[in-house]
């Protein structure tokens, strides 16, 4: 489980910046600004985590038990609430009501994982949803150009197996983009510029955390270069 420090933010859109060598970098802009609204501790809950809130929610749209919990902690109801696990040392740095700053959590050049909800594309066929090639367009093919082919089996087991790639709802799923690089931080506006795309449309809530599967790190097997034999 990812226990690296992280934040929740809102995807603003994409832009371009130049690096030190003049190369154009296509970046996704994420607006941070989440507030610590609660904590989990080892002594009470058995694990350590920060409960973060983003955006405001009208109290009339909040149930009374939840509104009472917010009032007890001195906070206003939040539209988005996420619980991010972290080390006890990291959780101890922040008090309830503190707004997380991007320059306190991340640094330029750091690798991060971004998680969000992908753009929904509705009911789609197998060519769009699964990149099937489709049937041939000649030699007697009739009204079968974009079909997925056979979905059945033999007499045993005699049924369509679960998990088969078929037409259905495409998108609107939780997607994680791994090992993205932070190109720039704007602490005065609490913005993060991340190289490459981040899942979801504009105004989508995303979770940004330190990368788990760092490139060249543990779990990554380096490519072995062939060595020439002596005298060969």
Curated annotation (Swiss-Prot):
Top-level lineage group: Bacteria
Protein name per its UniProtKB record: Large ribosomal subunit protein uL3
Matches recorded under Gene3D superfamilies: 3.30.160.810, Translation factors
Family: Belongs to the universal ribosomal protein uL3 family.
Record has RNA-binding as a keyword: yes
Keywords per UniProt: Ribonucleoprotein, Ribosomal protein, RNA-binding, rRNA-binding
Subunit structure: Part of the 50S ribosomal subunit. Forms a cluster with proteins L14 and L19.
Gene Ontology CC terms: cytosolic large ribosomal subunit
Pfam families hit by this protein: Ribosomal_L3
Record-level Gene Ontology MF annotations: rRNA binding; structural constituent of ribosome
Keyword Cytoplasm carried by entry: no
Reported function: One of the primary rRNA binding proteins, it binds directly near the 3'-end of the 23S rRNA, where it nucleates assembly of the 50S subunit.
